[in-house]
Amino acid sequence: MAVEKTNSSSSLAEVIDRILDKGIVIDAWVRVSLVGIELLAIEARIVIASVETYLKYAEAVGLTQSAAVPA
């Protein structure tokens, strides 16, 4: 994937369009502890993409296959 550099500034609409077109994943992990005792642990994975982009990549890794329904 090539990185394109431009000298002009981008508008907010262009940035949002690019994020939805390419997609972005934010992976976060937070741990709060006091005196060595873990009080809170949070793990989050946030995916921002258009439906078309998500389906394209989800199909590539097999996430769009429907599960068999028991009879």
UniProtKB/Swiss-Prot annotation:
Organism encoding this protein: Dolichospermum flosaquae
Annotated PANTHER family: GAS VESICLE PROTEIN A1, GAS VESICLE STRUCTURAL PROTEIN 2-RELATED
Family: Belongs to the gas vesicle GvpA family.
Stimuli inducing this protein: Gas vesicles are abundant in low light, and collapse after exposure to high light.
GO MF, one example: structural molecule activity
Subunit structure of this chain's protein: The gas vesicle shell is 2 nm thick and consists of a single layer of this protein. It forms helical ribs nearly perpendicular to the long axis of the vesicle.
Main location: other
Localization per record: Gas vesicle shell
Lineage: superkingdom: Bacteria
Protein name per the record: Gas vesicle protein A
Region of interest called Beta-strand 1, as start-end residue ranges on this chain: 23-32
Physiological role: Gas vesicles (GV) are hollow, gas filled proteinaceous nanostructures found in some microorganisms. During planktonic growth they allow positioning of the organism at a favorable depth for light or nutrient acquisition. GVs are highly permeable to gas. GvpA forms the protein shell. The ratio of GvpA:GvpC is estimated to be 33:1 and more recently 25:1.
Region (Beta turn): 33-36
Region of interest (Beta-strand 2), ranges: 37-46
Region (Alpha helix 1) residue spans: 12-22
Domain remark text: Solid state NMR studies suggest the protein has an alpha-helix beta-strand beta-strand alpha-helix structure. The beta-strands are thought to make an extended cross-beta structure which forms the hydrophobic core of the GV.
UniProtKB keywords: Gas vesicle
Residue span of region Alpha helix 2: 47-70
GO cellular component, one term: vesicle membrane
